[in-house]
A protein has these predicted regions:
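Secondary-structure transition/capping motifs at alpha-helix termini
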Residues: 11-32, 74-81, 119, 169
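Low-complexity, flexible helical/coil segments
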Residues: 14, 121-123, 184-188
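Residue-level signal for alpha-helical context at structural boundaries
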Residues: 20-23, 102, 130-131, 193
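C-terminal beta-sandwich/jelly-roll accessory domains of carbohydrate-active enzymes
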Residues: 128-131, 144, 154-200
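Residue-identity detector for glutamine
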Residues: 9, 28, 57-58, 88, ...
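Short edge beta-strand/loop segments characteristic of extracellular beta-sandwich folds
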Residues: 150-152
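Aromatic/acidic polysaccharide-binding cleft in carbohydrate-active enzymes
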Residues: 31-146
């Protein structure tokens, strides 16, 4: 749904720019442009609106999956989306950090952002999907001849086997996984590493 909204808004912006009156006479007008910015995206659960402190929201493994899917949408649409701002970064809604007294807890969303930072400054890498599994979402990018691939398994009950084929055999460098048996698992002051990214 978000991807469709992005495309619709881009079309509306372009149509609006096209409808603006063109300058007359010998003067050249500066090129008209208008960037699309997505603000305050992320999961907003209804319980947060009654929370004290206000809008405090725990982030679960399920939230991490939707964060990864949303970032992949933005990455696929960099030609249309100039900037996207996560709802909040600390203590509120889809945050990366939660505080509890003297504790600062990294949420599963933090790990997603940490894993995805390799795509900064990279180019989207096109690929062909055969026998697509609707529960697996894939995004790839390339930077300085390094290829980065995201695989997001949206199934909470089933592992998936994915085969990647390259025209030339690449050297495998590393893999990171964010996983939890229970999609409702989260990190807190007593269990700060319940849901954390692991090598392999």
């Amino acid at each position: 749904e978000l991807e469709n909204v992005i495309h619709e808004q881009r079309r509306l912006i372009d149509a609006g720019l096209e409808a603006l009156p063109k300058p007359e006479g010998p003067f050249q007008a500066a090129p008209r442009k208008c960037e699309l910015i997505v603000g305050e995206w992320g999961n907003w659960h209804s319980s947060a609106f009654n929370a004290r402190p206000a809008l405090y929201q725990q982030c679960t493994m399920r939230d991490a999956v939707t964060t990864a899917l949303t970032l992949d949408i933005f990455h696929r649409n960099t030609g249309d989306v100039r900037m996207a701002c996560v709802a909040q970064s600390v203590n509120v809604l889809n945050s990366l950090f939660l505080t509890d007294g003297e504790h600062c807890i990294l949420t599963p969303n933090y790990d997603v952002f940490d894993m995805y930072q390799v795509h900064q400054g990279a180019y989207t890498l096109g690929f062909e999907e055969k026998n697509k599994d609707p529960e697996v979402c894939i995004f790839a990018s390339i930077k300085n001849d390094d290829i980065y691939v995201n695989l997001v398994n949206t199934s909470y009950s089933e592992s998936k086997k994915i085969e990647l084929k390259f025209k030339q055999c690449p050297e495998f460098v590393e893999a990171k996984t964010l996983y939890s048996k229970d999609p409702q698992n989260y990190n807190d002051a007593r269990h700060p590493n319940r849901v954390r990214c692991k090598e392999g």
